[in-house]
Each structure stands twice: as C-alpha cells, then as structure tokens.
Amino acid sequence: MQLTQTNCIACGNKLPVPIISNIGILCPTCRNQGLFRKKIIITGITRMNSGHVCVSGIDPQTWSFIRPVFSCGLARDFLMQGTSQVINHFNLVEIEFKQYRPDQKFHTEDWVINENFAPRFVRHLSNQEIINVVSKISITNLNVAIEKQDKSLFIVMVQSIGRIWHEQYEKFRVRINFVDWDGNLYEKIPVTDLLTLAFIRHQINIGNMNYSNQIMSNFNNNPNRYIRIGLTREFHGQHWKQVTALITVPDLFDGQSFSYYENLIGGQV
C-alpha cells in the first residue's frame, strides 16, 4: 500500500510537495542538518540476543515512532546512568542521532545513534500525559495496521489478555494470547519486553505460580489497557509479532523497572 508523506519525519514541518513513499521523508533543512538531538517518549525496552537490548519510543514533535539503532547493537549500559535506569517506560529522554536510516517496508522507524552522546533523562510523564499519548497514537485493529507495511511498532487497544504463560527451553520465554479492540485473536505471541520477562521470572523465583491470573485480572480490569507490538526483521519470509510492552494506567508494574527485578533475581532475564 503506497502512502503519501506530507510532513518531515524529523521536524514535523510541511514538505514543499507531498511525496508518495512508505518511509518518512526529510525536509531540505533536516536533510542538510547533520546531527539530530531529539526528545523521545520511551515505550519499549526489549530483549535481544547476546545481552543486547532494543529501545524505541515516540517523537512528540511528529507523533511517529523512533527506534535508536547502533552498528553493533545496544548494550544494557546504554540504558543506565550509574545504577539508575534512565531509559524506562514513559520517560522523556533526549538522544542524539546521526541519520534517519529506514527500511523500505515495516522497519521505517530506525535512526542511527551518535554514540558520543549519552542519553539524557528529562522527566517521567504523568499518568494523564501517558493516557493522552497512548490515546493519540493507539490503534484498534492490529491486522489492518500491519497491512500498510509502513511501520513495525504499534500500540494496540486491547479487549483482554486470555492467557499468559512461561516456557523454559534454551532460555526463559513468555507467551501471550490476547484480543485487540476490534475482536481479533492473537495466540502464542512471544513477549520480548524486558520488564514483563523480569517480573514473571521474579514471581516464579518467589514461588508465586499464580502470577498469570494476577496479571490477567489486573490488566483486564484496568480501563486503560494496551499492548505494544513490534514486528521482527524478516525471518523465514515473515515479520513476526512480538509483545514489546504491557501498558496500563495506573501502571501494571507499579512504576518499577526491569533492572529492579533483575537485581532481585540476581542476573539477566
């Protein structure tokens, strides 16, 4: 599906002329700018291979998703300032980028990080601000949104989580069944959200095997309930769905970070 870009992906200003393109377009000023220092509302912190993480969020200037990328992967140190986790869900964080580097399909959100600039914490959003953000950018039908092939990150309004469970093979895994707001069922979707993974691993360690019912009850009875979905890079001919955050207001995890739970379990999840 071809889309028409009318605004600059970096600054949000109107382009001189509309351009038919799946990916974002830079205006002439931004194209010649060089470094971009942008404030990002963090909405996703996910587990990758080899101890790396993936971070992404929303640019409140353009209301588009941004995924900071680094040539050799993002180490967990990128998220921290000393012992404090600077990059946390719904923190506003300033990050400097070298360039916009989108794929032609799905992964149109990629921006290359300037590794010489440490992320700077600005503030944490209030509950009302979080509600305003997710209300503005959320979708009700994940299948329809994916058909456009113009993004790989989505915040989905959800009717309910039907099941959540863990598996242990070569590494600890969690999967979810859920129904989006329009009634579509998604089954056995893997969870890569570090906070959810670390929380559930901690619950198991303390012997709380009823964690599934507790999460579903707290999530399904919250009036503000969303699941953030990310699509993988192409693998075996598909872009696979992953759950990259469980979002509720008030917060399902009482404002705790994944690093808090990893400290409790004594290692990386």
PLM region descriptions:
Residues P16, L35:
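Short functional micro-motifs and their immediate structural scaffolds
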Residues F36-V53, I139-D193:
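Structural detector for short beta-strands of small beta-barrel domains
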